[in-house]
């Protein structure tokens, strides 16, 4: 495993972080024991950076992560970097954004309990909340840093001007945006902003929500409780087009003697503004395949070939809270 310093945080983190969105109930049923084994295997293979969120099952994902790392959180706490996110609230009508000071404080306390830790290394605002001023949100997190409950503050799904507004009260230390071969809009604004301000970037969705694993087809049937079952990007003509693009990528990956998953993850890490790629897994075998991507180097010619292949694909966006 390779490591890097996460922007201005000073945290030494593995270039691939273990993500836990898939353990929160939005991706269908899963075997919890297998998921715990996957987390533990990731740690054995050198991963020291783990990302979760209060909204991933509202405590469920955090509890699984805490259980999987229970011994390590006792014996090697200083070697682990635990990141979580807050600022979403579940209502009868679905998820809503709530980055109010009161909800963030409650969220931090709930996450500490669910994870079984006394502090959170990196706490991120999950989505910008247009109903609460950036100064209020940032001010509340600054107090939580002073209280010792969180170590560093980041944001997720923010654009450049939202980060600038937030930083007027408290410097944004990290950004967690969506980024993969089928979704590259942050290359124009957010990534240059982060490079200019030494903001650590940990990207989520490098496998395009499963599309870049090469395991999906027109015959794939998503479970009813998997958000992709109602997503237009995983059906219809755009999906067919992207499956053809994935097949072409898989052929190129084979030429490089890597899997398509490894190629996709390595591509995100090849961007000089990206520090870390967050990759989720439910099984040990998925972990071992994904982590090997940290050692894959892509030449400029390789990147050009990938760009040519991707020019035939359609954009793949993920869900927002309002769509979950």
Please provide the spans of the model-predicted regions:
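Conserved, mostly hydrophobic/aromatic
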Residues: 6, 18, 35, 50, ...
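Active-site beta-loop-alpha junctions enriched in small/polar residues
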Residues: 21-23, 53-55, 85-89, 125-128, ...
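N-terminal small/glycine-rich loop or linker at the start of catalytic domains
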Residues: 8-26, 83-96, 119, 124
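Short helix-capping segments at alpha-helix termini
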Residues: 71-79, 115-116, 144-149, 167-171, ...
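N-terminal binding-site loop/beta-alpha segment at the start of enzyme catalytic domains
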Residues: 1-80
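Glycine/proline-rich, positively charged
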Residues: 40, 44, 91-185, 189, ...
